[in-house]
Amino acid sequence: MALCCFAFSAPCLHLRSRRSCSSCFLLATSAAFFSARLLRRAFSSSFLFKYSAVCFSSSFSRSFFRFLFSSARRCRSRCVSPRGGAFSPGGPRRSRPRLSSSKDSKPSSTASSSSLSFNSSSKDNSPSTNSSTSRSSGHDTGKHRNSPADTKLTMLIISPLPRVWTESSFRIPSLRVWRLCTRRLVPHLWGTMFGPPTSSRPTGHLSRASDHLGPHRWTRYRLSSTVPYPSTPLLPHPENL
């Protein structure tokens, strides 16, 4: 982005002609194209697989959450005045919907939570009582008005993150999955531990402890395992070398 902005804006400051601006635009579009290609290459599956452990470590997520909390608080302190909110005379610049003083009118959708909390706190809904309470306890009412907004802002930013950036999705698979994978990938290693008796083996193979366990061992192995006995040459035990 910085490269695009520089390529597009820097020569236009010095040369005001249309030709230079068009050439700058071509430069900017080409830079954007190449940067998009580089980004696509950077976010390839191999790159993400390599650096996922670094990016999604617990320290990274902790610092990311801390940054989000601080930015949310900064945004709230900019948007909401420290004293009294909309009730104070030196309130924020942006216009807030005021509370309605009539009995029948409903509060607006933008200030529904704050106006509801204010109306529930005051039992008498007459216009004089509403105005007097808002004038007298402006500080407390402002606090009540601002706290739901703060909670909403924090929840809006923070709540979807644990579902997306959990470490559990990048964990090493469980022992059962690992065993299943290795049993299929390296069948001769699995065959060294559980093998059929000598009668069903090809002649000239090396003798092992599993050869002398009898036929019941072979039937048990056949029923329990999903992998047939491998036809690959078996690895010899170290005592037979």
Curated annotation (Swiss-Prot):
Residues 79-100, 107-136 have a biased composition (Low complexity). p30II is a multifunctional regulator that sequesters EP300/CREBBP and down-regulates CREB-responsive element (CRE) and Tax-responsive element (TRE) mediated transcription. Specifically binds and represses tax/rex mRNA nuclear export. Since Tax and Rex are positive regulators of viral gene expression, their inhibition by p30II reduces virion production, and allows the virus to escape the host immune surveillance and persist latently in an immune-competent host. A motif (Nuclear localization signal 1) lies at residues 73-78. Pfam families: Deltaretro_Tax (PF05599). InterPro entries: P30II (IPR008596). A motif (Nuclear localization signal 2) lies at residues 91-98. Belongs to the HTLV-1 accessory protein p30II family. HTLV-1 lineages are divided in four clades, A (Cosmopolitan), B (Central African group), C (Melanesian group) and D (New Central African group). This is Accessory protein p30II. One of its GO terms (cellular component) is host cell mitochondrial inner membrane. Residues 79-151 are annotated as: Disordered. Keywords: Apoptosis, Host membrane, Host mitochondrion, Host mitochondrion inner membrane, Host nucleus, Membrane, Repressor. A motif (Mitochondrial targeting signal) lies at residues 175-184. p30II binds to the KIX domains of CREBBP and EP300.
